[in-house]
Amino acid sequence: MIQQESRLKVADNSGAREILTIKVLGGSGRKTANIGDVIVATVKQATPGGVVKAHDVVKAVIVRTKSGVHRADGSYIKFDENAAVIIRDDKTPQGTRIFGPVARELRDKDFMRIVSLAPEVL
């Protein structure tokens, strides 16, 4: 579960390395976000020469969480880190590559471009 002020690793090659959550989108007074939810964040660390610079305000979708997610078949999946992918307004990723596995729940929430770029979908 991701909330305001949570720091996440960035799982793409957009130029950002770490982001800090400003707001969870999707409802009035919503406090937490899980896999597949969109957040507004600021870039805390960035690589030189990247598309995204430090201190930029961006939108991102969460692809991995330590808290995990329950599935309809009764299974439960957790990851070792909290990670997100920076997206544009039309839900397409800013970068051209995705690093690490992503959850299958992104397919249900219409992030098909992220699912197709990911090396592994769990």
From Swiss-Prot:
One term under GO cellular component: cytosolic large ribosomal subunit
InterPro entries according to UniProt: Ribosomal_uL14, Ribosomal_uL14_bac-type, Ribosomal_uL14_CS, Ribosomal_uL14_sf
Listed GO biological process terms: translation
Keywords: Ribonucleoprotein, Ribosomal protein, RNA-binding, rRNA-binding
Biological function: Binds to 23S rRNA. Forms part of two intersubunit bridges in the 70S ribosome.
GO MF annotation: an example: large ribosomal subunit rRNA binding
Protein name as annotated: Large ribosomal subunit protein uL14
Gene coding for it: rplN
Cited SMART domains: Ribosomal_L14
Family assignment from sequence similarity: Belongs to the universal ribosomal protein uL14 family.
Quaternary organization: Part of the 50S ribosomal subunit. Forms a cluster with proteins L3 and L19. In the 70S ribosome, L14 and L19 interact and together make contacts with the 16S rRNA in bridges B5 and B8.
Cross-referenced NCBIfam families: rplN_bact (TIGR01067)
